[in-house]
């Protein structure tokens, strides 16, 4: 029925308003929220402490509907990727990364991505649409309770997922109105109860929305930097033409006034001969000089259309040493899940190709990129 609402679309305020619209008392909203997000209930008949009259109302007017799982892949390193159906021929990926002391879920916010970073295979397919709040939080709901069931864990046992990163398909801050309620649910003690330090939003640098996020839900922030100067970043991250590095760094400083951590994480994809020289690293130090930060260096995950190569390990080590010598905490991301195309930048989705070449500039053409400290430009091959 067209008027059936998905309760996964509601944060605490939305669920309260919905219960009031049904003539119910406010405490019913908290009961519902705990059943949905702490017990994983998907049928109203399971909610035994709700009045029978409320359960009957909900059965005809609402549902609890996460995106349907199309496929479920397990990597040799324990990484798990779900491909989920978000309708209209679109699918997005959700990736779980297990570690000794935590379990991190990488969540998608859009079907496709309009930012079109040059090194990201997700951007190759173009942009279809924003996900709803229910489709975003539904990825966490689906993954948490699927793994709980598999492990035999009950509602009072420790959660499987301890950290969430908005680093899947899409630019979260270009879907702000749906992402913020999903973040609120992740933090809500009547839902997932994660601390702000354990929830990270990754952005390519949508400056106005970074400022809004700082005021509304100041979770940990990661910024996809990937270049040490505007000329290079204009090509690698085209959004830089709208919000260049000086504006982006100023926004990072403002965000730190509200952030749960006292630093910004800068993500930097290591591209052979493009952005990986010692000169680039030194230039980078000048760019971030007044921003408390750490760096996460990401070995590039090659895909055929990119025309790019991964920096070799020695070059990554030299680059990282420049940052470390300057006192900046620097990590090199361990490649995880690349045998199931779940590694960073590989979330292309088994969906129809939405690329509109006329609208996507130079993607697929020879692109000349200035290399700092080199005598010539680096030419990236055709996609």
Swiss-Prot record:
Disulfide bonds join 106-344. The active site is at residues 93, 344. It catalyses: adenosine(2503) in 23S rRNA + 2 reduced [2Fe-2S]-[ferredoxin] + 2 S-adenosyl-L-methionine = 2-methyladenosine(2503) in 23S rRNA + 5'-deoxyadenosine + L-methionine + 2 oxidized [2Fe-2S]-[ferredoxin] + S-adenosyl-L-homocysteine; adenosine(37) in tRNA + 2 reduced [2Fe-2S]-[ferredoxin] + 2 S-adenosyl-L-methionine = 2-methyladenosine(37) in tRNA + 5'-deoxyadenosine + L-methionine + 2 oxidized [2Fe-2S]-[ferredoxin] + S-adenosyl-L-homocysteine. It comes from the Bacteria. Specifically methylates position 2 of adenine 2503 in 23S rRNA and position 2 of adenine 37 in tRNAs. m2A2503 modification seems to play a crucial role in the proofreading step occurring at the peptidyl transferase center and thus would serve to optimize ribosomal fidelity. Reaction proceeds by a ping-pong mechanism involving intermediate methylation of a conserved cysteine residue. Belongs to the radical SAM superfamily. RlmN family. This is Dual-specificity RNA methyltransferase RlmN.
């Amino acid at each position: 029925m067209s008027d059936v609402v998905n309760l996964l679309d509601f944060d605490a305020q939305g669920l309260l308003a919905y219960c009031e619209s049904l003539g119910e008392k406010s405490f019913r909203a908290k009961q519902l929220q705990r059943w949905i997000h702490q017990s994983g209930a998907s049928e109203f008949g399971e909610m035994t402490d709700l009045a029978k009259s409320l359960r009957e109302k909900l059965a005809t007017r609402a549902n609890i509907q996460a995106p349907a799982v199309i496929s479920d892949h397990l990597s040799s390193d324990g990484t798990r990727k779900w491909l989920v159906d978000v309708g209209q021929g679109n699918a997005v990926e959700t990736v779980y990364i297990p570690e000794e002391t935590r379990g991190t879920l990488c969540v998608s916010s859009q079907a496709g991505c309009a930012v079109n970073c040059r090194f990201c295979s997700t951007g190759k397919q173009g942009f279809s649409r924003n996900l709803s709040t229910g489709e975003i939080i539904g990825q966490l709901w689906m993954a948490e309770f699927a793994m709980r069931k598999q492990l035999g864990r009950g509602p009072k046992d420790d959660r499987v997922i301890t950290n969430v990163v908005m680093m899947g398909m899409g630019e979260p801050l270009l879907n702000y109105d749906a992402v913020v309620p999903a973040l609120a649910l992740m933090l809500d003690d009547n839902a997932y109860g994660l601390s702000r330090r354990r929830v990270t939003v990754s952005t390519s640098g949508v400056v106005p929305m970074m400022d809004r996020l700082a005021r509304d839900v100041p979770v940990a922030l990661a910024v996809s930097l990937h270049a040490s100067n505007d000329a290079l970043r204009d090509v690698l991250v085209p959004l830089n033409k709208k919000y260049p590095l000086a504006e982006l760094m100023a926004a990072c400083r403002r965000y730190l006034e509200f952030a749960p951590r006292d630093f910004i994480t800068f993500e930097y994809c290591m591209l052979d001969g493009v952005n990986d020289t010692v000169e680039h690293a030194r230039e980078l130090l000048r760019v971030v000089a007044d921003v408390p930060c750490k760096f996460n260096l990401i070995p590039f995950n090659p895909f055929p259309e990119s025309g790019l190569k991964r920096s070799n390990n020695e070059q990554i080590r030299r680059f990282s040493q420049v940052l470390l010598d300057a006192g900046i905490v620097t990590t090199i991301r361990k490649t995880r899940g690349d045998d199931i195309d779940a590694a960073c930048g590989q979330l292309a989705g088994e969906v129809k190709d939405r690329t509109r070449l006329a609208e996507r500039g130079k993607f697929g053409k020879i692109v000349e990129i200035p290399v700092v400290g080199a005598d010539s430009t680096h030419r990236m091959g055709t996609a």
